[in-house]
Swiss-Prot record:
UniProt cross-references to HAMAP family, sorted A to Z: Ala_tRNA_synth_B
CDD domains: AlaRS_core (cd00673)
Family listed: Belongs to the class-II aminoacyl-tRNA synthetase family.
EC number: 6.1.1.7
Organism ancestry: Bacteria, Pseudomonadati, Pseudomonadota, Betaproteobacteria, Rhodocyclales
Protein known as: Alanine--tRNA ligase
Free-text comment about domains: Consists of three domains; the N-terminal catalytic domain, the editing domain and the C-terminal C-Ala domain. The editing domain removes incorrectly charged amino acids, while the C-Ala domain, along with tRNA(Ala), serves as a bridge to cooperatively bring together the editing and aminoacylation centers thus stimulating deacylation of misacylated tRNAs.
PROSITE patterns: AA_TRNA_LIGASE_II_ALA
């Protein structure tokens, strides 16, 4: 039964029991600042359980997207190395909001598992909270599970109610006992039942947890029965799929086999190995392929839900996951962007269940590709530093990676700390995290000391307000009312001082309404002050932030205040076009579009708005056309101050939740009319040209566009044109023929790759025939240790398979050398694996050539860095195998 069918059957079963099927919520928690990402099925129902929200249903069932990476729940470092850790997983759940309780929850679970999924009853074990006699009796007396397979778990975490079988939302609030269902994978796997000393083994695996919200815990820790108990359950789709598909590891289920094959194709693995991986168990596959199969899900779904790679918060977690994937692809041989190529395969597997993934396919691939290109520009140099440090450590016998080096990798080459730690883990060394943290703290302190002086609006000022003249003039005379240095009022500022100047009159616009503050110059009789930013100290008091360039300034002096006209004009273009763009977005996408935030400065406009789906290329073009038509119309801009009621009657657009005074400024520009206190162009034609350069998501239901105008728009368009012309010149075609020519080249490349694979296979077969004659008899079996010139690892593997078939009973070591590195494959036929293990054999050879490796008893792989020692290492194989036989 495939994963998609299991998901569908789960939802259909509970729908037949009166449950409302509810779509998965976004991975970005809605209005819950306590969560970095959605990590459980109940997250979207939290307010329902707390009584803050009412739904038209009392029973629900979901298949919820979840991510555990970053924050309290972080499985990132284990992904790829264990059977069941994931960054992304699907949680199947059924929920009762004051409707049914323990009896129905337990019987529903048992019916689904044993009658719908047909699991053997004797394979299922159950745990209950030690004091939950009700659940124990339902399991043993009503369901009929033998008492020896129903285990009571007490307070096993050092405090009252601190138990694996007692769930609490927090220190106070809803809580209650839970019952967990385990599947016994069989005695061939080590481990004991839950509660036993061997419970950490992998034989008994939890597949379903049913939480019974029965109590409300007060601040004194007293449990009060809830008037309407509820049920919250969760069953990992990956785990139940492994059980139903008869495999032990999650990475062996159909979904991951497909994605592992996709990863192999993306990094250029030979197609023969891809097919073998698809058709066999994946527990022998390199952890790196598992990392890629896992991470493509987390990254794609996060991007589809509006997260974009960045340097903080959710964006930085996403960047860490992407870069970890890139590093593992690099380890597998990828030297250019590859990860984004897996997106179509993921959409084929999961797009039907999650339409938002299918709708955002192009955007997801583009974001991944851009992030890959950025990191591939630095990864090679970064890896050289890593390898150099590891080599020095090996020489010195050191097992701790230098924290300052780790910080250099982070700061200069974009290596997140956990990526460096991941590499070190493979070499069995650790990173000095304390030294890394210290280096990070030093950099932050230096940045604070050297950075631009920018103060929050908390200066101690109790004087007259500033009169603003900047709507109609860019120069004005003013007197200095106050000066500040290091946040303290002073009488004067001298050359080199960073400070804040308060004037009685100014043409400088102070940052407000998303528009950046003006910059420019204050010129007095005794000195010149460079204004780098203008911020409001109080509602009507403007602070001019900057540095004294020459001479000095003193309180009471007069100055000539001059705004940087070019910067102001660019900002005005970007602000005015934001109004036109807002109107156009509502025309194209619908009236639900509302402003959620904006930033307007001389370089660009950034506009956040309410919308649930990525904009299509056609929608972006349509918005651009509408705005540029308004620009060409060259309509005059009009601003009027009026009563708030009059502004509302005029149809002026207002921001939801914004507080306005009794009088407001209404700006009419083209067909747009909004409340706005910013600075704008005189006519729409002054904007020149408008071009959207970025569209993406920033939160659940919030999209972001970035756009440029005027000269910046012209430069952007010319740069895009230059790139196309550059490609067309390389291809020797006209620009409008580039796409067709590239498609033809790709077809040729694919044909050549197939031909190369065919020739390598033919070469392997030919070499295999020649090598058979070189095998010698050892203890009644054949032994072969040989070098294949020019063979890559897939060719070594293919040759190994052919040799094992021909030699029947044999131990074989094949080697090749390329770029100063040794590749080794060891193979042992099934009849000899009881005495000779391929993993031990390949390690014996690898250790002599400066490497190590491992694998299955019948097939193993290794590498080395000392090819000059290879002949002696291969010559020693016969004695080693003879001793084993």
């Amino acid at each position: 039964m495939k994963s998609a069918e299991i998901r569908a059957k789960f939802l259909k079963f509970f729908e037949s029991k009166g449950h409302q099927i509810v779509a998965s919520s976004s991975l970005v928690p809605h209005e819950d600042p306590t969560l970095l990402f959605t990590n459980a099925g109940m997250n979207q129902f939290k307010d329902v359980f707390l009584g803050f929200d009412k739904r038209p249903y009392s029973r629900a069932t979901t298949s919820q997207k979840c991510v555990r990476a970053g924050g309290k729940h972080n499985d990132l470092e284990n992904v790829g190395y264990t059977a069941r850790h994931h960054t992304f997983f699907e949680m199947l759940g059924n929920f009762s909001f004051g409707d049914y309780f323990k009896r129905d929850a337990i019987t529903y679970a048992w019916e689904l598992l044993t009658e719908v999924f047909k699991l053997p009853k004797d394979k299922l074990w159950v745990t209950v909270y030690a004091e939950d006699d009700e659940a124990y009796d339902i399991w043993t007396k009503e369901v009929g599970v033998p008492a020896e397979r129903v285990i009571r778990i007490g307070d096993n975490k050092g405090a009252r109610y601190a138990s694996d079988n007692f769930w609490m939302m927090g220190d106070t609030g809803p809580c209650g006992p839970c019952t967990e269902i385990f599947y016994d994978h069989g005695p061939h796997i080590w481990g004991g039942p839950p509660g036993s000393p061997e419970e950490d083994g992998d034989r008994y695996i939890e597949i379903w947890n049913n939480v019974f919200m029965q109590f409300n815990r007060d601040e004194q820790g007293v449990m009060h029965p809830l008037p309407k108990p509820s049920v919250d359950t969760g069953m990992g789709l990956e785990r139940i799929s492994a059980v139903l598909q008869g495999v032990h590891a999650n990475y062996e289920i159909d979904l991951f086999k497909s994605l592992i094959s996709s990863a192999m194709r993306a990094v250029g693995t030979a197609e023969a190995l891809v097919e073998r991986a698809r058709d066999s168990m994946t527990n022998t596959i390199s952890p790196s392929y598992k990392v890629l199969a896992d991470h493509i899900r987390a990254c794609s779904f996060l991007i589809a839900d509006g997260v974009i790679p960045g340097n903080e918060g959710r964006g930085y977690v996403l960047r860490r996951i992407i870069r970890r994937a890139i590093r593992h692809g690099y380890k597998l041989g990828a030297r250019a962007a590859f990860f984004h190529k897996m997106v179509p395969d993921l959409v084929a597997e999961m797009g039907e269940a999650y339409p938002e993934l299918k709708a955002g396919e192009r955007r997801v691939a583009d974001v991944l590709r851009q992030e890959e290109e950025r990191f591939f520009a630095t990864i090679e140099n970064g890896m050289a530093i890593v390898e150099g440090e590891l080599a020095a450590m090996a020489t010195a016998g050191n097992t701790v990676f230098n924290g300052d080096t780790a910080f250099k990798l982070h700061d200069t080459y974009g290596f997140p700390l956990d990526l460096t730690a991941d590499i070190c883990r493979e070499r069995e060394v650790t990173v000095d995290a304390a030294a890394f943290d210290a280096a990070m703290a030093r950099q932050k302190e230096q940045a604070r000391a050297a950075g631009k002086f920018k103060m929050a609006a908390n200066l101690d000022y109790d004087g007259p307000a500033t009169t603003f003249h900047g709507y109609d003039k860019l120069e004005a005379k003013g007197n200095i009312l106050a000066l500040y240095k290091d946040g303290v009022a002073v009488n004067e500022l001298v050359e080199g001082d960073l400070g804040v100047v308060v004037l009685d009159h100014t043409p400088f616009y102070a940052e407000s309404g998303g528009q950046a503050g003006d910059r420019g110059e204050l010129k007095g009789a005794a000195g010149i002050f460079g204004v780098e930013d203008t911020l409001k100290i109080q509602a009507s008091v403007f602070g001019h932030h900057g540095v004294v360039k020459t001479g000095k300034l003193a309180v009471g002096q007069g100055v000539a205040a001059r705004v940087d006209t070019a910067a102001r004009a660019a900002t005005a273009r970007n602000h005015s076009v934001t109004h036109l763009m807002h109107k156009a977005l509502r025309e194209v996408l619908g009236p639900h579009v509302q402003q959620k935030g904006s930033l307007v400065d001389p370089d660009k406009t950034r506009f956040d708005f309410a919308h649930t789906a990525p904009m299509s290329a056609e929608e972006i073009r349509e918005v651009e056309e509408i705005v540029n038509r308004e620009i060409l119309a060259n309509a005059a801009t009009e601003a009027a101050v009026m009563a708030l009621d009059d502004a509302q009657k005029s149809g002026a657009m207002m921001l939801f939740g914004e507080k306005y005074g009794d009088e407001v400024r209404v700006l009419s520009i083209g067909s747009s009319k909004e409340l706005c206190g910013g600075t704008h162009v005189a006519r729409t034609g002054d904007i020149g040209l408008f071009k959207i350069v970025v569209e993406g998501g920033v939160a659940a239901g919030v999209r972001r566009v970035e756009a440029v105008t005027g000269e910046n728009a012209l430069r952007y368009t010319q740069e895009q044109e230059r790139r196309v012309q550059g490609v067309s010149a390389l291809l020797k075609v006209q620009p409008d023929e580039v796409a067709e020519r590239v498609a033809g080249i790709l077809d040729n490349v694919r044909a050549l790759e197939k031909e190369l694979a065919r020739l390598k296979s033919k070469l392997a077969a030919s070499q295999g025939e020649d090598l058979v004659a070189q095998a010698v008899d050892v203890g009644g079996a054949k032994l072969l240790a040989a070098t294949l010139e020019g063979a890559d690892v897939p060719t070594l593997r293919e040759t190994m398979d052919k040799l094992k078939d021909k030699l029947k009973s044999a131990a074989i070591v094949l080697a090749s050398v390329a770029d100063g590195k040794v590749s080794l494959i060891a193979g042992v036929t099934a009849d000899l694996t009881g005495k000779v293990k391929a993993g031990e054999l390949v390690n014996f050879v690898a250790q002599q050539v400066g490497g190590k490796g491992g694998g299955r008893p019948d097939m193993a792989q290794a590498g080395g860095t000392e090819p000059d020692k290879l002949p002696a290492a291969l010559a020693a194989v016969q004695a080693w195998v003879s001793a084993k036989l």
